[in-house]
């Protein structure tokens, strides 16, 4: 433990006012009067509680307190104000890493060593009750990296640094079990502290387990100093909250930002090289906590960005926020998400030119902009439609994809199908949880791929819905699936009993009911997916263009009614037409086969050439020529045809079929027997050479 505490990464600099607050806290907790000690003496009371809490199995044993006698000058006015306005809070074991430690930790975990990452950054912020139950709001900086983050360190002293969610690290999966244990230990510690609260923390009740999960979830992203912006936003609102203490869950992030308000630029430059000396298991337990907001299923869905806009208006004009943003280069779009990981809006990164006195007006600075189009999801976390303006456009895919198959207990749950809370870059955030996900794609691009690979129950065929135990006996879009299945089975039996083929039925329907009910609509699977999610005008244009191109309009309909390869709505539409036609066909059949033939029409005769039969002698000659040359010339094929007394076209087709059969054989052997594929390679080469 002593070696760990001597690490420069952990024993860093801290402002004197904050140290004095910590010293007063420790003096009250330990029953000792050491509030007026020097900076060098303050290190002992800060470190003592950490060692004493090791027996409680808390995450504090992995982190040391920060203190350094090098900072002896009084703090800046902002630091004085922070120490004066914020009442004392327990300092003991805080499961946080500072910005410097996070940056070096990422460099130590990621392959390659140097911090050359370019991954989205999630910055959590809570706005003192103005978000209406939105815990765990996260600010995402998709284009940030460790290079353009270094300029933000200077703003850390003024605005403070909050915790970051270092998701998408390779160490996440390997440390998952340790992180779960740390979470459990933290909850146990909180319960113990609630049972025995210190006398000086009466105004700061312990937060619910949800708040620590936020603080642990957020220390996980490679660009720590991006946190100054939200951290500087927080001090105005949480200050009054600490005095009133109406929402304990929002105290914890503020105390974390106070903790990380300590690092200075000199500390940033000196500490990163020391971090890799710690193993990932010891250096990143709390930062690498899995994305807990995905597990918080009790909070309501944030489908409106107005709440976030109201919250941001109170802190948009923060001078520290503007100073921090002025140092960002290459960071443009940001995303505001709630505790469920759902995007509720965007924030443009623009420094505020106005002074901090204009904070009350909220007219300048940052504004949350709602994202459109938005994605409509169901309770299983599947995207079922996109919302553009007032239109809901279903997303079609017969397979269906669950958006967040992360780990057990980490799947994203959506409250209802009617709530719209995800924006165009939902796929980007969801992919953050995958340790092997690539962040090179833009959020909109991710969303388009996610939406194109998602499905809704209305787009699935009847056969797929019937095979699903959850929907087999139910109704989809008001259509009884069991009734459709029974009708399709009976229709096929009735058709066969009349001696009719599917082609005949299609021709008859096309003649009597129109081309939309041709064989293509009943028997064959040919569909234009755009028919489902294009606007009505686009559908009409598509149909008109298909008619102009002499294409069957029935191709626009889902098909294969008899095999249930058709959507419920289309099946419900075509069912009465088939029933009416079949009843008339059966009536004509009872009146006489001639009447049925007149009703259906004769099937067009197809002239087919007689299949050629090769004699064994002819096959022997053909195989001998094929072994010599698989691609004979036209003159050679003519000579072979004259020699065998066959048509030249017959010989040409035989060589084509023989070559294709050889390719299929080689391909099949390579797939099923890799060991035997090696001797066949010279054969293939020789064949190609001869050709």
Swiss-Prot record:
Annotated region described as Disordered, given as residue ranges: 25-93, 186-297, 435-461
DNA-binding region: 607-666
UniProt KW keywords: Disease variant, DNA-binding, Homeobox, Nucleus, Transcription, Transcription regulation
POU-specific domain boundaries: 476-586
Tissue expression as described in the entry: Expressed only within the CNS, where its expression is restricted to the medical habenulla, to a dispersed population of neurons in the dorsal hypothalamus, and to subsets of ganglion and amacrine cells in the retina.
Subcellular locations according to the entry: Nucleus
Bias type Basic and acidic residues, positions: 25-36
Disulfide bonds: none
Chief place where the protein resides: nucleus
Low complexity: compositionally biased ranges: 186-195, 211-220, 239-280, 438-461
GO biological process: central nervous system development; ganglion mother cell fate determination; regulation of DNA-templated transcription; regulation of transcription by RNA polymerase II; visual perception
Family matches, as CDD domains: homeodomain
An example Gene Ontology CC term for this record: chromatin
Pfam families: Homeodomain, Pou
Domain of life: Eukaryota
Functional description taken from the UniProt entry: Probable transcription factor likely to be involved in early steps in the differentiation of amacrine and ganglion cells. Recognizes and binds to the DNA sequence 5'-ATGCAAAT-3'. Isoform 1 does not bind DNA.
Disease: Hereditary susceptibility to Wilms tumor 5: Pediatric malignancy of kidney and one of the most common solid cancers in childhood.
UniProt similarity note: Belongs to the POU transcription factor family. Class-6 subfamily.
Protein name: POU domain, class 6, transcription factor 2
The organism of origin for this protein: Homo sapiens (Human)
Lineage of source species: Eukaryota, Metazoa, Chordata, Craniata, Vertebrata
């Amino acid at each position: 433990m002593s070696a760990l505490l001597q690490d420069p990464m952990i024993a860093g600099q801290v402002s004197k006012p904050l140290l004095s607050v910590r010293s007063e806290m420790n003096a009250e907790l330990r029953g000792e009067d050491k509030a007026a000690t020097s900076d060098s003496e303050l290190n002992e009371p800060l470190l003592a509680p950490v060692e004493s809490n090791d027996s409680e199995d808390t995450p504090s044993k992995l982190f040391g307190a920060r203190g350094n006698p090098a900072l002896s000058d009084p703090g800046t006015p902002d630091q004085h104000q922070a120490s004066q306005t914020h009442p004392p809070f327990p300092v003991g074991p805080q499961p946080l890493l500072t910005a410097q430690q996070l940056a070096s930790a990422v460099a130590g975990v990621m392959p390659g060593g140097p911090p050359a990452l370019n991954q989205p950054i999630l910055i959590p912020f809570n706005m003192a009750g103005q978000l209406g139950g939105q815990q765990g709001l996260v600010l995402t900086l998709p284009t940030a990296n460790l290079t353009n983050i270094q300029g933000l360190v200077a703003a850390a002293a003024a605005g403070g640094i909050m915790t970051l969610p270092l998701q998408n690290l390779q160490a996440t999966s390997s440390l998952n079990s340790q992180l779960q244990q740390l979470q459990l230990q933290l909850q146990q510690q909180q319960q113990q502290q609630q049972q025995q609260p210190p006398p000086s923390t009466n105004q700061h009740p312990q937060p619910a387990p949800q708040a620590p999960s936020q603080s642990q979830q957020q220390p996980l992203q490679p660009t720590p100093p991006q946190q100054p912006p939200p951290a500087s936003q927080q001090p105005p609102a949480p200050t009054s909250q600490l005095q009133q203490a109406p929402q304990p869950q929002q105290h914890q992030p503020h105390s974390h930002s106070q903790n990380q308000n300590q690092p200075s630029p000199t500390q940033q430059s000196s500490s990163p090289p020391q971090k890799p000396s710690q193993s990932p298991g010891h250096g990143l337990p709390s930062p690498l906590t899995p994305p807990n907001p995905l597990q918080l299923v009790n909070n309501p869905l944030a489908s409106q960005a107005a709440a976030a806009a109201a919250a941001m208006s109170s802190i948009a004009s923060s001078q520290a926020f503007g100073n921090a943003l002025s140092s960002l280069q290459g960071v443009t779009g940001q995303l505001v998400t709630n505790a469920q990981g759902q995007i509720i809006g965007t924030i443009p990164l623009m420094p505020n030119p106005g002074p901090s006195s204009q904070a009350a007006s909220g007219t300048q600075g940052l504004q949350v902009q709602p994202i459109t189009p938005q994605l409509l999801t169901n309770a299983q976390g599947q995207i079922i439609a996109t919302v553009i303006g007032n239109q809901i456009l279903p997303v079609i895919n017969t397979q269906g994809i669950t958006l967040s198959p992360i780990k057990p207990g980490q799947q994203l749950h959506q409250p209802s199908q009617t709530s719209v809370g995800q924006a165009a870059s939902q796929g980007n955030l969801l992919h953050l949880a995958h340790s092997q996900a690539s962040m090179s794609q833009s959020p909109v691009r991710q969303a388009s791929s996610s939406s194109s690979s998602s499905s809704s129950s209305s787009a699935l065929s009847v056969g797929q819905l019937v095979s699903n135990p959850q929907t087999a006996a139910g109704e989809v879009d008001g259509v009884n699936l069991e009734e459709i299945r029974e009708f399709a089975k009976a229709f096929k039996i009735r058709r066969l009993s009349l001696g009719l083929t599917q082609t005949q039925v299609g021709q008859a329907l096309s003649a009597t009911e129109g081309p939309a009910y041709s064989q293509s609509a009943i028997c064959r699977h040919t569909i234009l997916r755009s028919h489902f999610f294009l606007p009505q005008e686009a559908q009409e244009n598509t149909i008109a263009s298909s008619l102009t191109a002499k294409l069957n309009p029935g191709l626009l309909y889902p098909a294969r009614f008899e095999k249930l390869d058709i959507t419920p709505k289309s099946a419900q539409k075509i069912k009465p037409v088939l029933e009416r036609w079949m009843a008339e066909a059966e009536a004509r059949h009872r009146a006489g086969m001639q009447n049925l033939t007149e009703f259906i029409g004769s099937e067009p005769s197809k002239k087919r050439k007689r299949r050629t039969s090769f004699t064994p002698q002819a096959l022997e000659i053909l195989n001998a020529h094929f072994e010599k040359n698989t691609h004979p010339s036209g003159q050679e094929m003519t000579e072979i045809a004259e020699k065998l007394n066959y048509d030249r076209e017959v010989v040409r087709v035989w060589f084509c079929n023989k070559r294709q059969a050889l390719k299929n054989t080689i391909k099949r052997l390579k797939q099923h027997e890799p060991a035997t594929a090696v001797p066949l390679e010279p054969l293939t080469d020789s064949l190609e050479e001869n050709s």
